[in-house]
Amino acid sequence: MKSSPDPLKPPNEAAKHAEFVIDLAKKLADGTRPGVLATVDEHGMPHVRWMATLSLRDWPLLYTITSPASRKVQHIRRNPGVSWMFSNDELNIIINIRGKARISNDAGKMQQVWKLLEDKSKAYFLSIATDGRGFAVIETEIEEIDCILPKYDIKFQAHGADLGSPARGLGE
């Protein structure tokens, strides 16, 4: 007979590391500092760019907005695998987030994500007149997180079940 986990027993090391990594990711990707988004084009070439308008408030989903005409939108539609990188100001804590991204132009989701984003001041594309909708939502469902402390050559990971159940996504 399988016994249920003892709530008084301390979590195992992997669980503690996963909790630590998730907490750091939430702090570093909180929308107050930019992150780097990497996508892959149709030729298999990587492309990276700074993204400064984002939210991790609907864990484990990371939201950002972009121009619907941007190359990253086309990259994600062809290959949804993306990677994000965040760091603290001293660059001694690095968080890498990997997952699958989706593009949404749904009006309801756009309104909900707009409300989640605290700082839109660096969404420069919003000041450029376009035909159609002014932005698209990039929703990344987080599948894996690495936390690296380069000064000490230490690496922690969280993935799969460690991240919690996938969120339903806004407006779904």
Question: Which role fits each region the language model picked out?
Answer:
Residues 27-42, 82-86:
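A short, Trp-centered hydrophobic/proline-enriched beta-strand micro-motif
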Residues 32-34, 60-62, 79-82, 133-137, ...:
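Short, surface-exposed beta-edge/turn micro-motifs
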Residues 34-36, 48-51:
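Short glycine-rich loop/turn motifs
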Residues 43-47, 100:
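Residue-level signal for well-ordered, solvent-exposed loop/turn and beta-edge residues enriched
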Residues 53-54, 108:
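A generic structural motif
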Residues 54-91:
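A short mixed-secondary-structure module that forms the rim of ligand-binding clefts
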